[in-house]
Amino acid sequence: MGSLPRLFRNDIKDFENTVTGYLKADKDRVDMLREELGLGNKKVVGISWKSIKSLHTQKKSLSLKEFGTLFKDVDIVLLNLQYGDVDNEIKEFTKSTGIEVLQCGSVDNREDLDGLAALIELCDLVVSTSNVTVHLAGALGKETWVLLPYVANFWWLLDRTDSIWYPTLKLYRQKKFQDWSTI
């Protein structure tokens, strides 16, 4: 399936009518998680700050501390969309910054993609490095800001701030190699 674009989309113009939101989260689960997390009508920003794919982990990832300071003094709820074991990292971040990151104990963000989709649906915005969360958010049609390394994967193309694959994504690129402060 991954090679189908080579057959059907041979030119940038072939992406002009890309459908957004072609996946849908389970509405009942979204409602259940909204209640479980006590979100009400609060503005929610879902965050994910690293990739666990070993080949590109270092260049695509940043620490939660680097990432989370983007949200200092902003009146929002941060919702953890990061997969993997990040409990200690979140506790340490909250302790050192005073910024709380809400976690959903009933969803394994790595193994339960339906649950992750429901969490993404709860968000007003997703902010993430390039990883599975970004692609799922794009497929759900969720407004997403993607933080890209200086040398990004080919599917993000060059010198673009939009994604031809997912119209709801906005791309932010490092200006200097391994320097996230330039975004």
What residue ranges belong to the model's regions?
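Catalytic machinery of carbohydrate-active enzymes
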Residues: 1-183
